[in-house]
Amino acid sequence: MAAAALLLGLALLAPRAAGAGMGACYDGAGRPQRCLPVFENAAFGRLAQASHTCGSPPEDFCPHVGAAGAGAHCQRCDAADPQRHHNASYLTDFHSQDESTWWQSPSMAFGVQYPTSVNITLRLGKAYEITYVRLKFHTSRPESFAIYKRSRADGPWEPYQFYSASCQKTYGRPEGQYLRPGEDERVAFCTSEFSDISPLSGGNVAFSTLEGRPSAYNFEESPGLQEWVTSTELLISLDRLNTFGDDIFKDPKVLQSYYYAVSDFSVGGRCKCNGHASECGPDVAGQLACRCQHNTTGTDCERCLPFFQDRPWARGTAEAAHECLPCNCSGRSEECTFDRELFRSTGHGGRCHHCRDHTAGPHCERCQENFYHWDPRMPCQPCDCQSAGSLHLQCDDTGTCACKPTVTGWKCDRCLPGFHSLSEGGCRPCTCNPAGSLDTCDPRSGRCPCKENVEGNLCDRCRPGTFNLQPHNPAGCSSCFCYGHSKVCASTAQFQVHHILSDFHQGAEGWWARSVGGSEHPPQWSPNGVLLSPEDEEELTAPEKFLGDQRFSYGQPLILTFRVPPGDSPLPVQLRLEGTGLALSLRHSSLSGPQDAGHPREVELRFHLQETSEDVAPPLPPFHFQRLLANLTSLRLRVSPGPSPAGPVFLTEVRLTSARPGLSPPASWVEICSCPTGYTGQFCESCAPGYKREMPQGGPYASCVPCTCNQHGTCDPNTGICVCSHHTEGPSCERCLPGFYGNPFAGQADDCQPCPCPGQSACTTIPESREVVCTHCPPGQRGRRCEVCDDGFFGDPLGLFGHPQPCHQCQCSGNVDPNAVGNCDPLSGHCLRCLHNTTGDHCEHCQEGFYGSALAPRPADKCMPCSCHPQGSVSEQMPCDPVTGQCSCLPHVTARDCSRCYPGFFDLQPGRGCRSCKCHPLGSQEDQCHPKTGQCTCRPGVTGQACDRCQLGFFGFSIKGCRACRCSPLGAASAQCHENGTCVCRPGFEGYKCDRCHDNFFLTADGTHCQQCPSCYALVKEEAAKLKARLTLTEGWLQGSDCGSPWGPLDILLGEAPRGDVYQGHHLLPGAREAFLEQMMSLEGAVKAAREQLQRLNKGARCAQAGSQKTCTQLADLEAVLESSEEEILHAAAILASLEIPQEGPSQPTKWSHLATEARALARSHRDTATKIAATAWRALLASNTSYALLWNLLEGRVALETQRDLEDRYQEVQAAQKALRTAVAEVLPEAESVLATVQQVGADTAPYLALLASPGALPQKSRAEDLGLKAKALEKTVASWQHMATEAARTLQTAAQATLRQTEPLTKLHQEARAALTQASSSVQAATVTVMGARTLLADLEGMKLQFPRPKDQAALQRKADSVSDRLLADTRKKTKQAERMLGNAAPLSSSAKKKGREAEVLAKDSAKLAKALLRERKQAHRRASRLTSQTQATLQQASQQVLASEARRQELEEAERVGAGLSEMEQQIRESRISLEKDIETLSELLARLGSLDTHQAPAQALNETQWALERLRLQLGSPGSLQRKLSLLEQESQQQELQIQGFESDLAEIRADKQNLEAILHSLPENCASWQ
């Protein structure tokens, strides 16, 4: 049965036409026919896939007896063994009955049994039309298995056939199902036909795809069956094994005998190509595909090629090949698609796309819409019909469009003549004004072509600067004349037409003829007119009525009427006009008259007096043409040479059209001008009141400018000279009369006020402060109101510093430069700039370091320099006596300049003086020595620098000198003898002079030496020696006894022995006295130096200028103590000098020695006290200077940062000064110790001899010494007391300085917060700019005054005034800047409301007090801080200056600041609301004011303000925008202005203080460099 079904499928799929070649798609005639690929086993060689295959792992299987391959033993399946594997490749390999191979699944022992299925999948690579599927089993066939297929590669699995003995149970399908005709034939059947267990081997299962399908015999017409047989993949699902039922015992041998095994898997069918291909093969991608014919494409030739869409695609059948036909696109496209509707209606379904050449239609057979072509072979062209002018956009075959009425053109793109503005409604008619247009309107825009002076779309109005639109005017409108001052004019109704006429009825009427040579003569006149002779080339000159102002003839005709012979042509006549330096010629522009050839005729020649006329030479602009007519000086007619006329030619009439005042007929060409400001008159020919000609007497053509009389008078409109009033003068009333002051530029009657100066002398006003300053004070006076004395004068005219004192000329003894400035003090008259080395209130003394007469008439005889010798003078004292010139010399130094030593002294050394020669009183002839070497003049035989020893070969040092030794040259060992005159003898010689031989010695024969006598003489010599020794012993005993000789042995008294050693002690006491006096003088010098240092401290503390009272009192007391000490020392020195010291004194200590010891102790204590006083005073001076500098800076009103910095610098200076004092004490201490050692040495030397004072003869001296000791003790106590006071004063000053430094702590915080206050300076920029302009004007006036007073002294005075004014302007600028800080202080720091309160209070406090720089961060804390700082400032200012404002005013101002601080809380809410809107503005302000903060104080204010003016203007525009912010700023500015008014009084006082301070600084700078300075 399976074989029968298989044969049926093959028969149905085979071609019906016998003999038709299935491989050819075209027959022998080239006609298409169906073609099919070969029928094949599609499974052969293709690799099938099995889900389960035995051998992995290897296993044993036991075939049933009777099965193929069954034997006695079981076999083994091993996938790794090529001989024993049974993989899926054996399904589709070559099948042989003899050598069978098979695929085998695992046995039941491995779980292969229902419901576990084993699947075999076969992929065909493309769609095949399957005829049958055959399976040959190596074992028994399965009890249940199924065949599935896929119609397309990505399609679902579809059931193909089910085989099962339990169809319903296993697959849910009935067994033995069949189909009726009309039912869906794509249904899988289930059958039990092949489900028996027998045969055990080699059973076949053949499935025919068309078996049981009713339409199988009509396969070509059944798409369902065609799709049913189509498959791309096949799947065999082996679901249940057939068993004998012995598997239930699970015997392994039994289970190993049940498994699936297939030896062959065959699929019969053809490659599906739908009848359009005869073969299949791999494509470029290696995939199996049909090689399509019949213009088809696709893997299965399932569609037509893109351009072969003329009919629908269809399978090729035996009856028809259904070849795809190409589309008909008329050669204008290569793309088309199949359109079923088009095919249904036309039989051709190919619809072309993307037709070229602007064609359209299914076959590109016609032009697109709005395109055309005149030849079907040509491309279509666009119609381009104008949409607005065409009835529709489609044109005919010629491209001509159908136009709307009033529209023309091939494309209906233009209007007909007389129409314009093509639109959807067609064209509109032109409405050009014929008087102003030249032709019809532009057909596109409708704009009319206007004449030169006409404008508008319709040419219906004159251009600006013209008027009187007239048809006969070639330019349309006439140009406005208005004397060049206006371009706006119109026709006036106040003038009528007027004709200037010459008809020659009564003669030539003033016309003259001029020949070529230039001579004038009356023309030839007859009743017919004036005879013209063209051959003579004469000119006719018009009379006066045609000349002059003929502006009203501009643009009007000048008509000449001639009487000419019949048939003659018009004469070539030229018209020449001259006037105002201009000239031009015109030719006639028209000809009129009857053309009667038989009679003489009248001919009119018309000339238009306008620049647009033809043949105008040279061409002139309209204004110049009218200017020529305004002053026409000559009008001449000239007949050019030409053909001789047939008869006489007469000029019968000349008519010039003009105008004159009247109403009818109106002369519309006369203008009335609309004059700009400053002009008046119908033609703007006059200057309006208050205006003048820019060029005096310039006439109506000159421009008018405003009178520059500053509202103080009127000016002549032609000359411009002002007639001034209101006490003003000048060409422009720009200054007040002498004796008046004010700002005449304000334009008010009371601008100039009488000067409040003596005798109403001249004055001026500072522009910003409005301060009146007198400029011509009486001789000897100066100042803003002449309130101070002029340079070189002194006094107090207004009694500002006491009783009024008139100004007197300073008396400086002729020792000042009369041309210098600041020679004397303006109040006291004390001279400040003394010359010729003079000083004093009136330069009546010589300066320190100079001597002579300061009042000498000749400068050479005045003060001369001391020129003290630097080595011999005392540098600490005054250089010299101011009268004698005697310098203060060091000890033992003399001469006026201390250039040499006293007699008896030598070796001049700096700081020490001269040393004593110390010439020996016995050995020297005098007590003087050489001033350089110190060599004394010795007595005979004496040598040594001090003549204190005998020369070699001399002895007997005495008052007479030394005597010669006269030692025997033969017997003496040397020329020098002993002090007793005995010589040193050679052996064998003896005697004082060694001039004899010893006893028992004799002189040799040669006389060279002494020879010993024989030995017998020795005994005698020994005995004589014994006797001599006893004599010597006796002699010694006699010398040791007191025999009334106080000085020595008798031989000394007799002059037999030296006397130097004996007499030397007689001079010890006088030498000690001199040394002691020298030390006393040194002590006196030290006291003087201390006094001078105290005086310098006194000056440094400004005790002469109301300095610190406590400090100055202590310094005065110290000076009194030093003065008393000096007096005591001088008294003691005088007593010591007057004492008579005896030649000898007691050897025991006396009371005098004790007093001397006490004096040394007192001197030491005095020296130490003086050192401490100097150190304390120096510290007091530094502390005072520091405090004074601090107070002075506060008085000047410097900012907190500068105050803090200065105080810190001063504190460092105090510490540096203390360190310097310690260094100075360390340097002075060795010198003091040296002095003390000297005093001690002197005391030790004199102590033995001072004991003589205990004798009765010394009682007066001892009494004096006791008094001196008592005074010294009192001096010590006084010095100790004042030392204590000085220490306390220094401690007090040190405490005050530390307290002052502690006051800077709030100023440090002020410095941090004051930087933000600089952001409040912008709103005063404009006012400051005006200030600078005023300052420049005033300085220019001062420079002018400088030219009037060329003397140097006057120049200096003017320069001082200019400096004062500049300083005031700068102060005023600072004031305005601070006012701006206050104005912006309410708006700028909006970023922080709490910080805003502090900054606002800081501005008020700084501008009010100039001393308290603390900020009001919070109202209460700021108030307490300001009060504390103000109280400290008040206490300090009372000691530093009498010009500080009263504390009551500061208290009121601080209360005002407190009230302002209270008002800040009310503004806090408004500030918070405005914060967001001003954030960007704050950034701009911060950048701007950062530059202001870094501004150099010496930079001109104008320069700085000009640099920032543009940024401030931009910010002002932003802040000036309307809104709530502007209103709030206005309120803040009003409040700031109120505060400004309250502070102005205090600022005025501060300005006065600054002025006084500047005067003091000027005095300070004028002092010589060696004068005392308190800075």
UniProtKB/Swiss-Prot annotation:
Residue ranges of domain Laminin N-terminal in the record: 31-270
Domain Laminin EGF-like: 271-326, 327-382, 383-429, 430-479, 480-489, 673-706, 707-754, 755-809, 810-865, 866-916, 917-964, 965-1013
Compartment list: Secreted, Extracellular space, Extracellular matrix, Basement membrane
Glycosylated residue positions: 87, 119, 295, 328, 631, 837, 980, 1185
Sorted UniProt keywords: Basement membrane, Cell adhesion, Coiled coil, Disease variant, Disulfide bond, Extracellular matrix, Glycoprotein, Laminin EGF-like domain, Repeat, Secreted, Signal
Region called Disordered, residue ranges: 1378-1399
Pfam families: EGF_laminin (PF00053), EGF_LMN_ATRN (PF24973), Laminin_B (PF00052), Laminin_N (PF00055)
Cleaved signal peptide residues: 1-19
One of the record's GO molecular function terms: structural molecule activity
Location of region: Domain II and I: 1014-1575
Span of the annotated motif Cell attachment site: 1059-1061
Keyword Metal-binding: no
Main location group: secreted
Comment field on protein domains: The alpha-helical domains I and II are thought to interact with other laminin chains to form a coiled coil structure.
Noted disease: Cortical malformations occipital: A disease in which affected individuals develop seizures, sometimes associated with transient visual changes. Brain MRI shows both pachygyria and polymicrogyria restricted to the lateral occipital lobes.
Subunit structure: Laminin is a complex glycoprotein, consisting of three different polypeptide chains (alpha, beta, gamma), which are bound to each other by disulfide bonds into a cross-shaped molecule comprising one long and three short arms with globules at each end. Gamma-3 is a subunit of laminin-12 (laminin-213), laminin-14 (laminin-423) and laminin-15 (laminin-523).
Function noted in UniProt: Binding to cells via a high affinity receptor, laminin is thought to mediate the attachment, migration and organization of cells into tissues during embryonic development by interacting with other extracellular matrix components.
Protein name, UniProt field: Laminin subunit gamma-3
Species assigned in the record: Homo sapiens (Human)
Gene from which the chain derives: LAMC3
